Regions:
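Helix-coil boundary/capping segments in enzymes
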Residues: 1-227
């Protein structure tokens, strides 16, 4: 896919992502250490058509479940990959991965081919995971083709990755909060990659930004979120 033209090169350079022997040697440096494994970048929605994406998700989940069976001391569990451009296929694979393969969660990305996670189309995934009481891993999805400025065609100097990924995570998570997800599912579990993006470090900025003196809160913000 054009917008992910460099991500394969980046992933290949991190050998422990795709080479088990390298990963095992690294894990051995930390003693009794295990990984809950997931499918790395790129998002399936960005590189495939819906039918192909659903097939790749099944192949990936079968392969990860097999790694867990072969190496339970290394990989105590896996989280399922989903291809979310076809929600009917997504629901089928979500239930299969958890019920049949023993996946202990699912991984999604901060946007689905440019669409935000908080729109109604994607809510069945959150509803299902709240029912299972299993976590959702949320990984940032942003490429160099998302420009830093409106006058440019692409991001420069790796800003899309260094700053873009934490921003992506923060916006996606904040919008899930303000959309009322945690009002509907107060016990839902979401694991954000990379220490939660910007949010844990921006408390002093978030509070005045969302609570401007003398201005009523935007109507779209649920009162419970701002209280």
């Amino acid at each position: 896919a054009p917008r992910l033209e460099n991500i394969g090169k980046r992933m290949q350079a991190v050998k422990m992502i795709h080479d088990l022997d390298t990963r095992f040697r690294l894990m051995d440096e930390f003693g009794n250490y295990g990984h809950v494994i997931s499918l790395p970048n790129p998002p399936l929605e960005d590189i495939t058509e819906p039918e192909v994406g659903a097939n790749l998700a099944r192949v990936a989940n079968d392969a990860m479940a097999e790694l867990v069976r072969k190496h339970p001391d290394r990989f105590p569990a896996c989280v399922a990959a989903l291809a979310m451009h076809d929600m009917d296929a997504t629901r089928v694979e979500l239930h299969r991965a958890i019920r049949d393969l023993g996946a202990r969660g699912v991984q999604i990305f901060t946007n689905i081919a440019g669409k935000p996670l908080d729109i109604p189309k994607f809510q069945p995934v959150f509803d299902a995971m709240a029912e299972y009481d299993l976590p959702i891993w949320m990984h940032p999805a942003r490429a160099a083709t998302m420009a830093d400025y409106a006058s440019e065609e692409r991001s420069r100097f790796e800003m899309w990755w260094c700053f873009g990924w934490p921003y992506e995570t923060s916006v996606a998570m904040a919008r899930l909060v303000f959309s009322g997800l945690f009002d509907r599912h107060p016990d839902i579990k979401i694991v954000t990659h990379h220490l939660g993006g910007m949010i844990p470090f921006f408390d002093g900025r978030l509070r005045p930004g969302l609570d401007v003196p003398g201005r009523p809160p935007p109507a779209e913000h649920p009162p419970a979120v701002l209280s």
